[in-house]
């Protein structure tokens, strides 16, 4: 009896310690059970890949967050070791086989395709079409936007692009002969941001190009967000905590965040105005008026979307995603292209020679995009830049909710995220000779069907990038103007290929993080 009483007394004495240790023991046991399940009993347990990647998402987080976006290179090493299909985290597969690309990235008529929820959850932009998980819901939101971004529509909006291009060239000429060093990557971010503003909300008070130094905070804000994406995407609760922090405190911690808030508020005001104009029956009286004034959100508000999809909150999320995607992706490709052209005298001179005649009357007359896309060397330069520096190098996982996917002898279970990287497609040495070299002439020589098959800078399928035509038009107009006879004479300043090449592959690729940027002077 005394022994039992002693045991009870001991338990009572250590009650507090047990209450503290108990949850910890439970958490550890649960974690171990989860790891054992993932490695040996999960539906993906049969697929090859390192056990640590199968066990925990922390392996990916370590490579991307602490390794500066290096998980893509680790995935490449996995493929070299384990083969064309590998398990890269507890729930996801990666395939490195060009033949499978058109099987995975398909249109809605072939198969319904869902997105990976962590994309939208991590950035808290589930209201935008690009972050919408369900195939049918995504299609509902995307369909009204497609006409605005079609090639014909971009041609009608071309006057706005040309005006911004003229402003860009005029601003660069202000530096002519001064010896002042200019950040060209800031310039391109400003240009891309202004294009999105003009086409989306047309706010006259917002102009990055007219900012005294092209508003470097705009560039830095997006780069900071991109570097945080591995954390947000793997731990979606982080962004929800950030949302709880008062705006005033956030702006004290990082004053640059005010620009993102300002963009959202301008978008909200424009969307409210567009909805009020619709309610009052105020529409564009003719095609010319529509061509000059209609914005993306005018277009969406007047579409046949159900009212539930036209909430100000949802459309404001759409505006933020369009601004982010439309700024960073296009600007990064222009960064890469400018460096490669300026470093290669023969490429640069051939481009200047081709542009001498068509651009001779700039800025009084600017050739249309339709005219400029017929210039073979200019288009080859752009296409090769998009091959080596696509706006998205992330693996872009797709989910088949209703059908198993078949890859060779492998049966991929339904609802399994499967991704492929454009960079792997573009760097295939069996398709592109000397794949790491910038050689625009490859697109003018013996172009094979495999080269076209592997060329996927904007991905394919029902979730293909909406802004393909806008991106091509913007890059074409900018570089035709910069390297035409009336363009500024740019000269690189302490800048090399590594300052423009994609090196850190977060959701969006960035150059090496210790780069001082793409610096140039403008010669007299």
Swiss-Prot record:
Cofactor: heme
GO cellular component: membrane
UniProt pathway annotation: Mycotoxin biosynthesis
GO molecular function term, any single one: monooxygenase activity
Cystine connections: none
Sites where the protein binds heme: 465
Keyword Heme assigned: yes
Sugar-bearing residue positions: 126, 344, 496
Keywords, in A-Z order: Glycoprotein, Heme, Iron, Membrane, Metal-binding, Monooxygenase, Oxidoreductase, Transmembrane, Transmembrane helix
Broad enzyme group: oxidoreductase
TM segment ranges: 16-36
Localization of this protein: Membrane
Membrane topology note: Single-pass membrane protein
Family per similarity comment: Belongs to the cytochrome P450 family.
Its job: Cytochrome P450 monooxygenase; part of the 2 gene clusters that mediate the biosynthesis of fusicoccins, diterpene glucosides that display phytohormone-like activity and function as potent activators of plasma membrane H(+)-ATPases in plants by modifying 14-3-3 proteins and cause the plant disease constriction canker.
Protein name: Fusicoccadiene C-8 hydroxylase
Species: Phomopsis amygdali
Gene that this polypeptide is encoded by: PaP450-2
